[in-house]
């Protein structure tokens, strides 16, 4: 993830930088690398929902300025918040990776995540990301989760795990099995 998420806001709020210029510089400096952005679905990079035409234009502009992969997610895993951004990203011809926000609750079972991955595949996702932003995914749970998702859809799967608990490397190694 080279752009998007909080980097856009941080450029403006804290660094007095133009986030679009930053993206263009990244693209120029990394001509042989794909630049991925983290996109909060209908929230784009902000903290509220935006109108569909704003979503469309933002995604189109991001693609034109150097984004190659759109990693699209909703923190609550609500597909309704992802549908428009996904359509807009697919229209650019860029890679669309839809992310599952991993959480540990009685509701969040492997079947729930597998069903979500199937929905994302139906939306036209090119790949799935298990986004473990709190670092709570354990190795054997990752193994079982990847198996469940692989049964639900035939898309490449990535794991993005933070090292908060120190388990990220072991988790990713077990998930690869």
PLM features: residue spans?
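Glycine-rich, proline-tolerant flexible connector loops at the mouths of alpha/beta enzymes
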Residues: 1-23, 41-47, 70-81, 104, ...
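Aromatic/hydrophobic pocket-lining residues that form the small-molecule binding cavity
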Residues: 19, 23, 55, 82, ...
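Glycine-rich beta-to-alpha transition loops that act as phosphate-gripper elements at the mouths
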Residues: 37-45, 101-107, 156-169
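Hydrophobic alpha-helical hairpins/lids featuring a short glycine-rich hinge
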Residues: 49-92
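Conserved anion-binding
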Residues: 84-117, 123
């Amino acid at each position: 993830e080279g752009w998007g998420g909080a980097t856009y806001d941080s450029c403006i709020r804290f660094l007095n930088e133009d986030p679009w210029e930053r993206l263009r510089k990244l693209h120029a400096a990394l001509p042989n690398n794909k630049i991925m952005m983290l996109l909060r679905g209908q929230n784009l990079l902000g903290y509220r929902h935006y109108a569909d035409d704003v979503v469309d234009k933002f995604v189109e502009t991001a693609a034109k300025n150097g984004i190659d992969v759109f990693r699209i997610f909703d923190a609550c895993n609500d597909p309704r918040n992802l549908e428009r951004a996904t359509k807009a990203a697919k229209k650019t011809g860029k890679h669309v990776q839809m992310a599952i926000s991993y959480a540990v609750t009685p509701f969040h079972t492997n079947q729930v995540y597998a069903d979500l991955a199937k929905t994302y595949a139906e939306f036209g996702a090119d790949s799935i990301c298990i986004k473990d932003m709190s670092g709570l995914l354990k190795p054997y749970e990752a193994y079982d989760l990847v198996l469940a998702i692989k049964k639900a859809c035939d898309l490449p799967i990535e794991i993005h795990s933070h090292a908060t608990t120190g388990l990220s490397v072991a988790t990713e190694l077990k998930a690869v099995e």
